[in-house]
Structure formats: C-alpha cells, structure tokens
C-alpha cells in the first residue's frame, strides 16, 4: 500500500479486501435447533448493536451440530453487519470458539493486514459512511435489505495503518469514557455521547476522491 504514504488515503471496494458472505437460512433450519442454554452462541441481528455484541438475548447451538456448520464459525476480528431489518448495525467478534453466524447477518472477514477491523467498525458507524453508502443506497430503491453484492461494493477510505491505529486509540478512549458515565445524569450522558460522535465523525471524514 505504498500509495497510502504518497497520497495519504486510498479508496478501496470492500469486496477487494474482505470476504463478505452470509449463511443461507436452510443451512440452519436443516441442522440446528436453538436452545435457551448452552455454551456456543448463534449471533443474530438483535445481538449486533451500536458497534458491540449485545448478549442480553441469545440462542445457543448444541455442540453436536457444530461439525455441520463450518461456514458459520466466527473468529476474533470478524465483523458482523445487519443487512435486513435494522440495517447497518455492526459489531466485532472478540472471542474464538464461542460464536457462530446465524442467518440474516452478514460476515465481513478482512483479508489484508493494512486494514484494521477496529478501524472498520468505527468507520461503519460514522456519518460519512452512512451518508455516502447506506442512506444513498436505501433512498435509491425500495429495498428492505442490502444484497451481498451491494455490500461488497461499499467504498472505504483507507489511511495508513498508523493513522488507523491512532483513530482507534482516540475513539476507544472516548468510548470507555462514555461507558463510564452510564450511571450518570442523563444530560451529562447525552452531552458526552454527542461529543464522542462529533470527534468520531471528524476523525473519519476524508476528502472525497
């Protein structure tokens, strides 16, 4: 990625640097019966919220079914993207051997060392991404979901890995600070959240190509 150091930021289609896929519904219905208890979690759309995994309401998969779901196994650094229903929610997988992909959630698995999953997660939450990719796509059609081929066409601004890491470090600190205020006054929490969103969008807004 020498051009990153010459021009600062390069624009790349997601499908050129990541595997984007989903699990067909029949792959689950054929092999899996959900359970309300267990160890292996099937991550559904409702578990992907505000950049994080929300594990308040989960369904489990029996370990005896796992050998039939090799395409569904998730790894650290995998990013989930909701493409139907509440479109555009993202989260990163933070553990191995615990999570499997359920239907109606897209898996984005980055295949290049110059693109950091943590940077991707923050960028997918930014106003720049929503204004240039999601909103434009939804406004141009009556689709209630985003097909995989459209997701693969998402255009990403990719700065150097050093810049990506700096952005992630700053936003991680803001995120931690906001979480520390969850028991504070509502007005204070709202103000801090707006401040976080402002700096996130400033850091993740690049000159259009």
Per-segment meaning from a language model:
Residues 1, 8-10, 120, 152-193:
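Amphipathic alpha-helical segments
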Residues 3-25, 188, 194, 199:
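Non-catalytic DNA-recognition/assembly elements of restriction-modification systems
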Residues 9, 14, 40, 74, ...:
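Short, structured motif recognition centered on aromatic/hydrophobic residues
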Residues 17-31, 46-76:
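Sequence-specific dsDNA recognition surfaces
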Residues 35, 98-101, 175, 185-201:
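Short amphipathic alpha-helical linker/capping segments at the junctions of internal repeats
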Residues 44, 69-72, 76-126:
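A short beta-sheet element
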Residues 99-106, 139-160:
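A short glycine-rich beta-alpha junction/loop motif
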């Amino acid at each position: 990625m020498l051009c990153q150091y010459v021009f600062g930021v390069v624009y790349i289609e997601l499908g050129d640097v990541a595997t984007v896929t989903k699990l067909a519904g029949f792959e689950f219905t054929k092999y899996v019966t959900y359970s309300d208890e267990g160890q292996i979690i099937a991550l559904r759309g409702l578990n992907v919220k505000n950049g994080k995994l929300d594990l308040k309401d989960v369904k489990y998969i029996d370990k005896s079914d796992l050998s039939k779901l090799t395409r569904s196994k998730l790894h650290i650094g995998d990013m989930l993207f909701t493409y139907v229903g509440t479109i555009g929610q993202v989260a990163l997988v933070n553990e191995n051997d615990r999570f499997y992909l359920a239907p109606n959630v897209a898996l984005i698995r980055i295949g290049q060392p110059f693109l950091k999953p943590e940077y991707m997660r923050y960028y997918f939450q930014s106003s720049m991404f929503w204004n240039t990719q999601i909103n434009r796509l939804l406004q141009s059609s009556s689709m209630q979901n985003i097909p995989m081929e459209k997701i693969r066409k998402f255009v990403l601004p990719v700065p150097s890995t050093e810049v990506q890491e700096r952005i992630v470090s700053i936003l991680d600190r803001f995120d931690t600070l906001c979480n520390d205020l969850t028991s504070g006054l509502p007005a204070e929490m709202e103000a801090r959240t707006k401040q976080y969103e402002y700096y996130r969008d400033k850091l993740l807004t690049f000159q259009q190509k």
